[in-house]
């Protein structure tokens, strides 16, 4: 018996989806955050859902949220405030899938660029963002609680 690769790709693509998530998903967002980078409290998550211009996308594998991207649109720019993939699903293309979706979404909105901050010591994240043509445009010294610097990254978008 041979497996049809097109059929397998079809099944795989049916298992992965991205949807805009809302305030009712706070507990799921907080849970994923707690298991990964522990960046925000539940209150901070609640505040993100209320910010004007903020969009929150969840990357789902079957019905499990395995990735989250939070970005805020201000004028003609998008600021990524949060981007994470569940540790069990890293280095399997899920983060790239979510980032590609974000970039296409921003291009459809005719935004000119995407901005983000990343810890200078987070080499894995830096490599990830460089694959999507984010370049370093600045630095915020001693930005994080541990004294590490934040690199300001920017990706220029192709608009019509």
Give the residues covered by each predicted segment.
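Active-site acidic-Proline motif in GNAT/NAT acetyltransferases
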Residues: 86-92, 120-122
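Short glycine/proline-centered loop/turn elements that form peptide/ligand docking sites
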Residues: 95, 99, 122-125, 142-147
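Short coil/turn segments at alpha/beta junctions that flank glycine-rich nucleotide-binding fingerprints
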Residues: 92, 109-112
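Conserved catalytic core of the tyrosine transesterase superfamily
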Residues: 113, 119, 154-157
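Terminal substrate-recognition subdomain of acyl/acetyltransferases
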Residues: 2-11, 149-160
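Short hydrophobic clusters on alpha-helical segments that form packing/core surfaces
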Residues: 102-106, 114, 125
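Acetyl-CoA-dependent GNAT
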Residues: 11, 16, 20-88, 99-101, ...
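Conserved catalytic-core motifs of GNAT/GCN5-like acyltransferases
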Residues: 115-117, 130-151
């Amino acid at each position: 018996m041979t497996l049809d690769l097109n059929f397998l790709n079809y099944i795989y693509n049916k298992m992965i989806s991205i949807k805009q998530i809302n305030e009712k998903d706070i507990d799921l967002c907080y849970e994923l955050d707690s298991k990964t980078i522990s960046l925000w409290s539940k209150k901070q998550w609640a505040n993100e859902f209320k910010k004007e211009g903020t969009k929150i996308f969840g990357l789902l594998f079957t019905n499990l949220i395995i990735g989250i991207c939070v970005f805020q649109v201000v004028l003609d720019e998008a600021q990524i405030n949060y981007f994470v993939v569940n540790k069990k699903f890293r280095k399997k293309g899920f983060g790239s899938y979510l980032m590609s979706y974000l970039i296409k979404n921003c291009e459809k909105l005719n935004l000119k660029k995407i901005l983000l901050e990343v810890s200078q010591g987070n080499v894995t994240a830096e490599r990830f963002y460089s694959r999507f043509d984010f370049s370093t445009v600045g630095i915020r010294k001693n930005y994080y609680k541990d004294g590490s610097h934040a690199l300001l990254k920017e990706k220029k978008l192709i608009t019509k």
